[in-house]
């Protein structure tokens, strides 16, 4: 590991302070900006997200799956006074968000089982589903209706 950390430090990917602690280097920020400028998927998706938000009267999110979490890339907020909002870049648990439930329902069953049985599914509210078995009927319902709903989970 020491060799890898040294290589990353030399490349500017990480920094190290006098106490030996590491943190992300400026080079990673530069790479992120370059990728963001070259491939702004949120700009491509935004007109479609706006159209969907206008049609449904709800907030619309563009998210990606990252292991057992979803990361919000873009958002179009509903005009309703009571609406769901999310911070861009926020990492949310896959098992208690509508975005995560969609990934689980429309991905492979093997992947859903792997994610939902890998560790403890933390209950964020009394309504949070916390077992693979509890998820099966919910995922079947989502596949049938074509959308997912988060209900105070």
What are these regions (language model features)?
Residues 16, 63-64, 152:
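Short beta-strand
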Residues 5-9, 142:
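Basic amphipathic alpha-helical segments that dock to polyanions
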């Amino acid at each position: 590991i020491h060799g890898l950390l040294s290589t990353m430090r030399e490349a500017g990917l990480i920094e190290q302070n006098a106490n030996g602690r590491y943190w992300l280097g400026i080079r990673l920020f530069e790479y992120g900006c370059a990728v963001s400028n070259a491939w702004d998927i949120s700009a491509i998706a935004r007109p479609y997200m706006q159209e969907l938000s206008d049609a449904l009267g709800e907030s619309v999110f563009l998210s990606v799956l990252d292991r057992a979490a979803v990361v919000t890339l873009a958002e179009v907020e509903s005009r309703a006074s009571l609406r769901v909002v999310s911070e861009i870049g926020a990492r949310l648990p896959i098992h208690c968000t509508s975005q995560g439930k969609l990934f689980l329902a429309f991905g492979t069953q093997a992947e859903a089982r792997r994610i939902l049985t890998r560790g403890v599914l933390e209950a964020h509210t009394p309504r949070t589903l916390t077992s693979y078995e509890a998820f099966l009927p919910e995922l079947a319902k989502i596949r049938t209706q074509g959308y997912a709903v988060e209900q105070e989970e």
